[in-house]
């Protein structure tokens, strides 16, 4: 099957076949990271610019390592070092970047839709590394790869996603991706963190964590985004932890072989206890490891996407 | 206008060619000491498996067998798009080994160059030898096979295909003219 997307803007636009192809490609690229020489010449001569208008360590580093392992030239730009702080518009920034002839721009932005805006106006490929509260496709794909590796399949699994659903682009992308591959998704959080109508995305909604976790194959905890919380959302972190924190006792409600996931960074003692975060069921570092492989796959696949679209015409 | 096809090697001829290549490998390397087979996906890997079986029949030794996928090492991403990436599986240390790289058809030599690059990234073999079922010429790189099943002079526009059955046994080699 051919991959004919020039951009990776979200999971919503992808088919189940696209997702499976990305996961299969990532499996092959994962082997590269396990060798003593962790580099292949696949994207030699390509230029990848990571433009991060929001703080990020994990995703930016993961994309940078992915680009370097494929022999691409990678450049990082963060908000504090960009001309945005001097008042430049996103479009002007994009046009200036385009003039430097990059092949791929990896972009994180606090505004939902910013990568789409860029993709419509510029010639290079755009990969969304998280836009506002909209989507975080590479995170959802690495989550799916981790689930597939641990469970052997995705179809038929029950996945509970717990936490601040309102602000979570990770949750949104995961709902789309898991639905497309045939998993049952449960969303759970305090009423103030569950946007009205979220069930229309194709998930069951729970307000009690015990109900959401019961019988689940996968428990995915989300970070309480303290920087985005208004005072009305949470009475206190302690209360949140009591009602929605994942503890060893609550994990006993899930299936015995259930896995625990977290996109990081974790607030230990808030959404997840240290006993669970460090326990035998956690696959959190597997997610980070798979992140590099998934991002290598995305960089590789979009590099050929334009040609395939051309040849299909 | 349809293509015309000619069978240039049938199953028996392929079998004889593989047996001869196996003998030549043993003679050239004075046995199987440190010899390992690595087939290039897809086609070369099936032939490498057959050669392993021939070497086992002749010498009574099972030489290590691996598979290399060269998609990550191709130099034509810009013109051909992102092809599906397969798995490289070399379950033995490459360092110090005499690697017999196996492919079905040798044409420009670019696939072999990519496979050698891939092997060198995995380890440092003592040497790399090349076994191919068909050498059809038209080299674009200075690459020469050590073991050849059949030399077939071709035009650049023609195609040479090795066909395999459901059990991945080679059944015929066809020359297709446009």
Curated annotation (Swiss-Prot), chain A:
InterPro entries: Asp/Orn_carbamoyltranf_P-bd, Asp/Orn_carbamoylTrfase, Asp/Orn_carbamoylTrfase_sf, Asp_carbamoyltransf, Asp_carbamoyltransf_Asp/Orn-bd
One Pfam match: OTCace_N
Record keyword Cytoplasm present: no
Binding site for carbamoyl phosphate: 58-59, 108, 136, 139, 264-265
Assigned EC number: 2.1.3.2
Catalytic activity of the protein: carbamoyl phosphate + L-aspartate = N-carbamoyl-L-aspartate + phosphate + H(+)
Protein role: Catalyzes the condensation of carbamoyl phosphate and aspartate to form carbamoyl aspartate and inorganic phosphate, the committed step in the de novo pyrimidine nucleotide biosynthesis pathway.
Name of this chain's protein: Aspartate carbamoyltransferase catalytic subunit
Lineage of the organism: Bacteria, Pseudomonadati, Thermodesulfobacteriota, Desulfuromonadia, Desulfuromonadales
